[in-house]
Amino acid sequence: MCDQLSQFVVDKYVHLKDFLAKESCAELTAELKRLVAEKQTTQDSQCPKSEAVHGAMAFDKLLVDLLPHFERASGRRLYPTYSYARLYAPGEDLTIHTDRPSCEISATLTLGFEGDVWPIYMGDEGKANANKIDMVVGGAVLYRGMDKHHWRETYTEGK
């Protein structure tokens, strides 16, 4: 069993470093900022300070393009359900939670940021014994969304 698959099976998540090319990340970041500028985004109750978009064409395409890579890392046949992109604002946090059934296996990718790295945390039972994962541009975490508690502390940097 490959290292990524082993980690996913045992830990219920795998950190995929250098997963997406920096050029692709820059293009997708520019697309998200364009959607924000054109007011094609919204806020949600989970992160009300931030702008988000559900089902944008560029991110839906990314979901399909990355599917085979996520299937290899998880050892499972996966069915894409939806894409969701968010431009986090300073002062935002992501409250500890698990995901709904349509997010049985989820991925988070970092496409761009200003300032310091903003980690995501993965834990089994709340915040005790959680793992901090530094998310750099091009990095991803594939995880069992209904099983892994995940969150981000307050974001103090730029966007």
Describe the predicted segments one by one.
Residues S24, Q40, R77-L78, D93, ...:
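Secondary-structure boundary/capping signal
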Residues D65-H69, Y84, S106:
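Generic beta-strand or strand-like secondary-structure segments
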Residues A73, E92-I96, R152-E153:
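Short helix-to-loop capping/linker segments positioned immediately adjacent to catalytic or ligand/cofactor-binding
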Residues L87:
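Conserved active-site beta-strand element of glycosyltransferases/polysaccharide synthases
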Residues P90-D147:
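Catalytic core of non-heme Fe(II) oxygenases with the double-stranded beta-helix
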Residues K148-K159:
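Ligand-binding loop in jelly-roll beta-barrel domains
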